Design a protein with these regions (language model features):
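Intrinsically disordered, low-complexity regions
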Residues: 1-4, 21, 112, 202
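Generic low-polarity alpha-helical segments
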Residues: 4, 8, 28-31, 102, ...
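N-terminal export signals
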Residues: 6-28
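N-terminal functional modules and adjacent low-complexity/disordered segments of proteins
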Residues: 12-13, 18-19, 35-38, 213
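Glycan-processing catalytic domains of CAZymes
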Residues: 38-355
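C-terminal segment of N-terminal export signals and the immediately downstream linker at the start
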Residues: 1, 23-48
Length: 355
């Protein structure tokens, strides 16, 4: 029995040392202690692509389909530190709630919706960490998961209007609170859907002194669930026509547009990004790209993406003139602290490329 206990103690101690050593690996140079550790040649090819750097990330703690890592404040502090070293700023809370699950005890939702009372105030925690590391924080809205999908757009709007008022009153004093994220993700022209973006976005800006608003819709391409189930993918021309109409409806309510980049094939991406930039310029929006750092090509949902695939997308974004790159998302798929070993390796490859 004692032998078993000693074995477990040794094993856990080893795991802790490994986790600690992963955290020290970061893109910002740090003072190195002289060791006998062997260095290795990367064998990089001479004409390898040159991507643009990732400068922002989503925070996916109220998750749709990504497993939770069950982090507390200590673990999140370590991850914010790793983000900062990689040059990430801002961080964007992808949503304040989804269905019954909410990020903080929002009274406007607890009083009207059938939601669970949360054990942790995630918004206060994230804002406190963003303050500590001098990072900007964008607050993501509540996604009912039902009203807007059922055509009850006004109900979705009213919930988020009340949420904006409560959140700004409670958390607006934080220096890091610098923007809003409109969480409902759409791809094609949906009747009255743009009304949510317009009304909620304008209200958020009015309440907060014109802080920036951001959306991250997806392209109706070959890798969307709908197309893989038999629907027809949008051509580049169709994508331009439909989003020209949507953006015209939300003009003045959205400042940053960051299309998700994972629903089209790698060789198609550049053409869609060029159109996205053209549309953003037309409507005086900043054009970012949402670089998905998870792999849609695998049969398992979802694992960290292969470095070569990420580099292909970063290069396409650079050539298309994207103004910034945000990833979905660092903590699961790129962090040296992630539960996925591949994420730490992706972080290493990324740092080798950009340092």
């Amino acid at each position: 029995m004692n032998g078993r206990r000693n074995f477990l103690k040794t094993a856990f101690a080893t795991c802790s040392l490994l986790a600690g050593s992963k955290l020290l690996t970061a893109c910002t140079p740090i003072k190195k202690v002289a060791t006998d550790e062997e260095t290795f040649e990367t064998f990089a090819t001479p004409d390898a692509l040159k991507g643009m750097p990732i400068k922002a990330t989503f925070l996916d703690e109220i998750s749709w389909d990504i497993p939770h890592q069950n982090w507390g404040t200590k673990e999140w502090d370590q991850d914010f530190k790793a983000m900062k070293k990689m040059g990430i700023n801002p961080v964007v809370l992808i949503r304040a709630g989804l269905g019954k699950w909410i990020a903080s005890p929002f009274q406007c939702l607890l009083g009207k919706e059938d939601v669970y009372y949360p054990p942790v105030d995630l918004v206060e925690m994230f804002l406190t960490l963003a303050d500590k590391y001098n990072m900007a924080f964008y607050f993501g809205m509540y996604d009912s998961g039902k009203y807007w999908q059922e055509g009850l757009f006004q109900k979705e709007i009213d919930l988020n209007m009340a949420l904006i008022d409560e959140v700004w009153k409670k958390y607006g004093h934080h220096k890091s609170f610098q923007g809003w994220y409109l969480s409902q993700e759409i791809s094609r022209r949906t009747k009255n859907m743009s009304k949510i973006y317009a009304e909620v976005g304008k209200h958020a800006k009015a309440v907060s002194g014109n802080l920036s608003t951001m959306v991250s819709p997806y392209i109706h391409g070959v890798k969307t669930d709908q197309v893989m189930a038999g629907d027809k993918a949008l051509s580049v021309k169709e994508h331009e026509e439909e989003w020209d109409e949507i953006l015209n409806n939300v003009n003045g309510a959205v400042d940053i547009m960051a299309f998700q980049d994972g629903q089209v094939d790698y060789h198609e991406l550049y053409d869609y990004l060029v159109i996205n930039k053209k549309l953003a310029d037309k409507y005086n929006m900043k054009c970012w790209t949402n670089i998905e750092s998870f792999d849609r090509d695998m049969p398992i949902r979802f694992l960290p993406i292969k470095w070569e695939k990420l580099l292909l997308k970063l290069d396409a974004a650079r050539r298309a003139g994207m103004e910034n790159a945000i990833t979905f998302e660092f903590s699961h798929f790129m962090s040296p602290n992630s539960a996925y070993l591949q994420a730490g390796h992706l972080y290493e490859r990324y740092c080798e490329h950009f340092i």
